[in-house]
Amino acid sequence: MEMTLMDAVLNSGDTAWMLVSTALVMLMTVPGVALFYGGLTKKENVLNTMFLSLIAFAVTSIIWVLYGYQFAFGADIMGFIGSPVNLLMNGVGVNTAAALAPTIPDFLYIAFQLTFAAITVALISGAVVERMKFSAWLAFIVLWVSLVYVPVAHWVWGGGFLAQLGALDFAGGTVVHINSGVAALALVYLLGKRKDTRLLPHNLGYSVIGASLLWFGWFGFNAGSALTAGGLAASAFLVTNTAAAAGMVSWVIMDYLKVGKPTVLGGISGAVAGLVAITPAAGFVTVPAALIIGLVTSVISYLAVSYLKPRLGYDDALDVFGIHGMSGIWGSVATGLFAAPFINELGTGLIYGNPGQLTAQVIAVAVVAAYSFVVTLIIGKLLDFTVGLRVSGKEEMEGLDTHLHEETGYRI
């Protein structure tokens, strides 16, 4: 007799680890991203910047339990979307095992995936700070999560056509980082440049704390994506830390070469770039491969931020595309190069004799990037035509905290 999910035996160790991992990933958004981004903006915009991440988490949480999870992870329909048979969580039992993680409860897997959806849209906010209407941002969250994140998550993780193609993404290189980075690029194209495009961090201490919380939370992000408390989680944990450390050191070296001094902002940017790049590869690569991935990714992101952005003239305020988009692309491609079958039998990369894996990775990168860019442009155009995307010039110059929220971050 075939065992059903109701008959599956839940594992208390796996469940405990995944509860911790889910909380760790939540910590990345609230308050990790909020603090990281908030410290990098002008003091007149710190509350608005932080609130963009907080409200993204709240709105996405509602979308996810209403319909988002089911469309992303429901039974596959023609490779493109999931079947919404359990809308509003109807039919999901307290002790029902998750279909994609049969040793943990379904509710826990739903919550874990919720934190990924929330941080993805929160990351986009870093590109549009200091000039986007809050009302437009609220509408953008609903439309983007529904029309971009949910389908892409299904294609890669929910049994959709990219999964069927064999594309690997252990914890979100395509679904989270390429998706958010390219969407950010599309949105800033529509918004245009700020009146003052200088990066003037008003409190780098906030950003250091935020980056530290991101680094800490990323162990839940990557090691948690093993979905069990076993050897694969431990391997993902170690390679995640290795890539982050290599990314930080690499960016500091680039700072020395360009300006002659190390910068704190450069160090934390490099760590985040390393974390982004190892995300798709964390459950597939060795420690030496993680070291290479981290060292290389900071060079790529550094060049994107320092040379590509000014050459192309787009105003990605906090370099979401330069760090998340570019490092996500490199990490996804690197997975196709370095995936080791003795780490995870699901992946064999080019250097271990499987060029087809690299091909699958490149296709996934191209498909997700193209879809995210085009649909984000359409969403942005629609919002610009209806509610308007951008605040007034007066509001932008005087700061969004007082004009949009009637509050101020500091009373000194």
Swiss-Prot record:
Q: Which GO terms describe its cellular component?
A: plasma membrane
Keyword list (alphabetical) reads: Ammonia transport, Cell membrane, Membrane, Transmembrane, Transmembrane helix, Transport
Per the UniProt entry, the signal peptide is none
What Pfam families is this protein classified in?
A: Ammonium_transp
Q: What is its main location?
A: membrane
Keyword Membrane tagged: yes
Annotated InterPro entries: Ammonium/urea_transptr, Ammonium_transpt, Ammonium_transpt_CS, NH4_transpt_AmtB-like_dom
Bilayer topology: Multi-pass membrane protein
Keyword Transmembrane part of the UniProt annotation = yes
| Annotated localization | Cell membrane
Residue ranges crossing the lipid bilayer per the database entry:
16-36, 46-66, 71-91, 107-127, 137-157, 170-190, 204-224, 234-254, 276-296, 320-340, 360-380
Determine the domain of life of the protein's source: Archaea
Instruction: Supply one GO molecular-function term.
Output: ammonium channel activity
Q: What is the similarity comment for this entry?
A: Belongs to the ammonia transporter channel (TC 1.A.11.2) family.
Q: What is this protein called?
A: Putative ammonium transporter MTH_663
